[in-house]
């Protein structure tokens, strides 16, 4: 949203984060702004330079040369916009330089400002998080020219998200190098893994998933266990309309037949944005559909309180991941990367990082 608390959080993160680095004796050569919410770190550096005697023009050039803006959003209009009075109350008290104060106030249009405009103005290097995202992201600058983003596809930390035994298998077979990156012939080496080894790793993953599920509750307030011999599909990501968590339930007859014929279960989990009333309603409709169908009621499980632990357990212990965003609306996504790193099948539209 665009309320005072959101701006307060961004101010605390940016100005407070930059001050914390100074107190730790850290003088960063380059600051990476991961999304617009961190922009006030660059503004804090600009204020510091001007307060120490550098003129505004030279300070802006310096900050631009030493700041990288990583954008994860496709449309500028989707980001928060704040009123001048909010900046006067929450931002200006953190700025000492009159030159920086005046420059900041000049960025407003009709008394409103999106902080991403500051990110565009105060950074020279800008990147999107997939090739497709960098190509289609629509962010105009002050002159209404489209900003050019370089493409750097998001990745994941294998140590965090991959079953340890699977990761060790990758190392033992030369599938990844000492930096955790795929080797040139990783595909051929993956193909050479035996079926027995793969089944063993999947068995370990299912055991870990069921351990986590013991402490979780489904839509009926009960814990569940997925049989070792059952195929498990999952949808585990933020519940946003463009991600279409409801799509598999638009044809319940087909879904029912798939689950029966393949001895399969389906886990649905994720969080709805607090203000997304439409998505809440769609989720409620899906849960009612499941409740009214004996097969779906037995085999489709909505797990409450989605978090990192559950996300990791499903990446490790499920068999196939459902990733079906509307093409052109996903910047990158990383859940699918965690899935394929754990040797799962990926059922996906070709969007974001998947398209790469």
Predicted regions and their residues:
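Catalytic cores of carbohydrate-active enzymes across secretory and cytosolic contexts
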Residues: 1-356
């Amino acid at each position: 949203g665009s309320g005072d608390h959101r701006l307060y959080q961004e101010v605390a993160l940016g100005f407070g984060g930059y001050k914390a680095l100074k107190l730790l004796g850290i003088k960063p050569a380059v600051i990476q702004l991961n999304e617009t919410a961190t922009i006030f770190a660059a503004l804090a550096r600009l204020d510091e330079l001007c307060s120490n005697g550098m003129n505004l023009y030279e300070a802006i050039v310096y900050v631009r040369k030493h700041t990288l803006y990583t954008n994860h959003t496709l449309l500028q209009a989707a980001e928060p916009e704040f009123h001048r009075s909010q900046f006067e109350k929450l931002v200006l008290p953190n700025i000492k330089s009159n030159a920086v104060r005046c420059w900041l106030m000049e960025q407003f249009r009709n008394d409103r400002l999106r902080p991403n405009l500051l990110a565009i103005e105060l950074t020279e290097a800008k990147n999107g998080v997939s090739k497709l995202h960098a190509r289609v992201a629509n962010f105009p600058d002050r002159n209404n020219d489209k900003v050019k983003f370089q493409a750097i596809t998001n990745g994941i930390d294998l140590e965090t998200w991959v079953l340890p035994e699977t990761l060790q298998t990758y190392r033992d077979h030369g599938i990844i190098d000492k930096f955790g990156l795929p080797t040139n012939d990783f595909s051929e080496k993956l193909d050479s893994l035996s079926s027995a080894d793969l089944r063993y790793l999947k068995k370990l993953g299912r055991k870990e998933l069921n351990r986590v599920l013991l402490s979780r509750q489904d839509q009926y307030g009960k814990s569940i266990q997925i049989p070792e011999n059952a195929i498990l599909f999952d949808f585990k990501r933020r519940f946003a309309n463009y991600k279409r968590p409801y799509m598999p339930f638009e044809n319940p007859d087909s879904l029912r037949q798939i689950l029966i014929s393949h001895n399969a279960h389906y886990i649905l989990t994720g969080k709805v944005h607090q203000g997304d009333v439409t998505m809440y309603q769609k989720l409620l409709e899906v849960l009612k559909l499941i409740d009214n169908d004996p097969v779906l009621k037995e085999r489709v499980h909505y797990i409450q309180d989605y978090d990192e632990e559950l996300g990791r357990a499903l990446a490790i212990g499920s068999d196939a991941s459902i990733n079906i965003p509307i093409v052109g609306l996903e910047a990158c996504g990383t859940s699918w990367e965690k899935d394929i790193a754990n040797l799962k099948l990926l059922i996906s539209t070709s969007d974001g990082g998947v398209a790469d």
